[in-house]
């Protein structure tokens, strides 16, 4: 049904006859047919009509089927004529006269031109180029003649023959042009034709001859004296004072200018000490000029290097830091102190520093079934972050301290520090084990440390660890301790302690289940500590010395008396009389 509504090409052929017989107005209307209709007709022609029915170029283009809009891209650019067009050159000729406007280097006769031109000539562009080439050839020929004449005169003078007897031509014009044609061809081939385009100064005799040739009858002689005075005044520079400059007679002072010295006695003859010119003095300093030059070059190089570094740093800001850059990050950055839930309520605060207790285990080791963990202490897999060690000093002891070596404070050895997993209250205050404190001290001193960092405020003495010696290291573990086979004997531990405060309770406040309440008693301490099971950890075999625990606790608590005498009043009186305090007290840093 749609095919009946569309017009076919055969119907268009019939319409073309009527269109051609119609008026011009109807023919113009056929041009304004829409592109959509022409496209639809083309589709119909592809479906029903053969390709030979397509309109040929020689047909009438006024019909609707020949409508083809021109592409904008194929449209040729219209050439716009230039606004300025040169069709010819007009040359004006001026007669020569005495100038009185310039100062030649020699002589007193200057060249100038009259106010009105004497001739006018018009050339086309090609003709003017030819005229310029001809004038240059003529100038070059004249110069070659002058050179030839000068050469002949020099030969005669060298031979001692007078010019009158030799019969040489007195002027350049007397020389034949044919004699210099060969030299002219060589000069043109050598590029001397371009040298003629530059103006060359004429000597005084040549200037005088040009003026007389142009019709000048009288040459002013006064101009020669004026030009000589001008040249002398320009050559005269500086004052003529002899080492001492008098303001009343100094030419620089009278002229109102400063005295100047480029080198010794030039242009001014006065010295620095004898110059009394009120206007001042200027001296040329080679060292100052060289220094300024070097400083300028250095500044330019620094600016260039900074610019190149900025360009290299800009693309690197978006990329992740390299391992080398991460190693440059400080090991203990300033950060906020950790909260209780992060450290398992094992952190204490003081008025000076923040300390935290953490324990860690070697990666790849699993916890043995017979090694229970305490909820109050961090697990063996706890890894303290960098921010947790913000304002704390790391306290550890190396094996080199056991031999009586000096205490060394090492920076940047956090990777070698071990978490003090053996630090547990059951080993210190255990009631069932009388030697718990000594065993904890001995186990702490016998731990395998590769490097240590001692707190300078702890006042610890390494000599208290010499009693055990190195012989006990071959005996095995301490009595009452078990070493699970699954645990690595080389696993290290460390503790973060701050002993810069003078308070004796800060070390004990870091222990779990320790709270300073109003009804706190020593019995409660014993009961609470008995319920805590001591963790199992590897210990080197050292014989428990008798003085090691007392010396270590004495150094920790800051007591001058022996530890045996100071431990009882410490537990009986100081634990009961302590004011209530929380485990975590925020202290502004």
Swiss-Prot record:
GO molecular function: DNA-binding transcription activator activity, RNA polymerase II-specific; DNA-binding transcription factor activity; DNA-binding transcription factor activity, RNA polymerase II-specific; sequence-specific DNA binding
InterPro entries: CSRNP_N, Cys/Ser-rich_nuc_prot
Keywords: Activator, Apoptosis, DNA-binding, Nucleus, Transcription, Transcription regulation
Expression tissues: Ubiquitous. Most abundantly expressed in lung, placenta, skeletal muscle, pancreas and leukocyte. Frequently down-regulated in lung, kidney, liver and colon cancers compared with their corresponding normal tissues.
Lineage top rank: taxon: Eukaryota
GO biological process terms, semicolon-separated: apoptotic process; face morphogenesis; platelet-derived growth factor receptor signaling pathway; positive regulation of transcription by RNA polymerase II; post-embryonic development; regulation of transcription by RNA polymerase II; roof of mouth development; skeletal system morphogenesis
Segments of skewed composition (Low complexity): 17-41, 345-368
Protein location: Nucleus
Major localisation: nucleus
Pfam families: CSRNP_N
Function: Binds to the consensus sequence 5'-AGAGTG-3' and has transcriptional activator activity. May have a tumor-suppressor function. May play a role in apoptosis.
Protein's recorded name: Cysteine/serine-rich nuclear protein 1
């Amino acid at each position: 049904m749609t095919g009946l509504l569309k017009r076919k090409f055969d119907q268009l052929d019939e319409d073309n006859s009527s269109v051609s017989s119609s008026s011009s107005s109807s023919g113009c209307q056929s041009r304004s047919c829409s592109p959509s209709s022409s496209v639809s007709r083309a589709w119909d022609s592809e479906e029903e009509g053969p390709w030979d029915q397509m309109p040929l170029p020689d047909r009438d283009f006024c019909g609707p089927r020949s409508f083809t809009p021109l592409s904008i891209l194929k449209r040729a650019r219209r050439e716009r004529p230039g606004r300025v067009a040169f069709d010819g050159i007009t040359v004006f000729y001026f007669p020569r006269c005495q100038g009185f406007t310039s100062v030649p280097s020699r002589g007193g006769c200057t060249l100038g031109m009259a106010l009105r031109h004497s001739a006018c000539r018009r050339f086309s562009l090609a003709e003017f180029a030819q005229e310029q080439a001809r004038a240059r050839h003529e100038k070059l020929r004249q110069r070659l003649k002058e050179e030839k004449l000068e050469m002949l005169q020099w030969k005669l003078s060298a031979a001692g023959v007078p010019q009158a007897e030799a019969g040489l031509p007195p002027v350049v014009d007397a020389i034949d042009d044919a004699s210099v044609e060969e030299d002219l061809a060589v000069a043109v081939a050598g590029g001397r034709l371009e040298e003629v385009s530059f103006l060359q100064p004429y000597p005084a005799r040549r200037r005088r001859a040009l003026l007389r040739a142009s019709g000048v009858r009288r040459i002013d002689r006064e101009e020669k004296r004026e030009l000589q005075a001008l040249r002398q005044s320009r050559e005269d520079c500086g004052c003529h004072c002899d080492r001492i400059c008098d303001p009343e007679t100094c030419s620089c002072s009278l002229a109102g200018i400063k005295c100047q010295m480029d080198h010794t006695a030039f242009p001014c003859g006065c010295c620095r000490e004898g110059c009394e010119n009120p206007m001042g003095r200027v001296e040329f300093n080679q060292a100052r000029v060289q220094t300024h030059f070097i400083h300028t070059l250095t500044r330019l190089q620094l600016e260039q290097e900074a610019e190149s570094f900025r360009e290299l740093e800009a693309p690197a800001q978006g990329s992740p830091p390299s391992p080398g850059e991460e190693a440059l990050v400080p090991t203990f950055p300033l950060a906020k102190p950790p909260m209780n839930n992060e450290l398992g309520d094992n952190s204490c605060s003081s008025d000076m520093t923040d300390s935290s207790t953490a324990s860690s285990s070697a990666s790849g080791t699993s916890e043995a079934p017979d090694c229970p963990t305490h909820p109050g202490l961090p697990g063996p897999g706890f890894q303290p972050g960098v921010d947790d060690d913000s304002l704390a000093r790391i306290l550890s002891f190396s094996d080199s301290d056991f031999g009586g070596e000096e205490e060394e404070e090492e920076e940047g050895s956090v990777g070698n520090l071990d978490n003090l997993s053996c630090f547990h209250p059951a080993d210190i205050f255990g009631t069932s084990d009388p030697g718990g404190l000594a065993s904890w001290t001995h186990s702490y001193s016998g731990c395998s440390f590769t490097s240590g960092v001692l707190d300078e405020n702890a006042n610890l003495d390494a000599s208290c660890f010499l009693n055990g010696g190195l012989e006990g290291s071959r005996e095995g573990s301490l009595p009452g301790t078990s070493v699970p086979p699954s645990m690595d004997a080389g696993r290290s531990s460390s503790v973060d302690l701050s002993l810069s405060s003078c308070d004796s309770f800060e070390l004990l406040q870091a222990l779990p289940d320790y709270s300073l309440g109003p009804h706190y008693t020593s019995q409660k301490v014993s009961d609470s500590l008995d319920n805590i099971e001591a963790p199992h950890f590897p210990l080197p075999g050292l014989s428990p010395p008798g003085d090691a625990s007392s010396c270590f606790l004495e150094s920790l608590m800051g007591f001058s008396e022996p530890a045996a005498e100071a431990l009882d009043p410490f537990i009986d009186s100081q634990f009961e009389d302590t004011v209530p305090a929380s485990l975590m007290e925020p202290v502004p840093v």
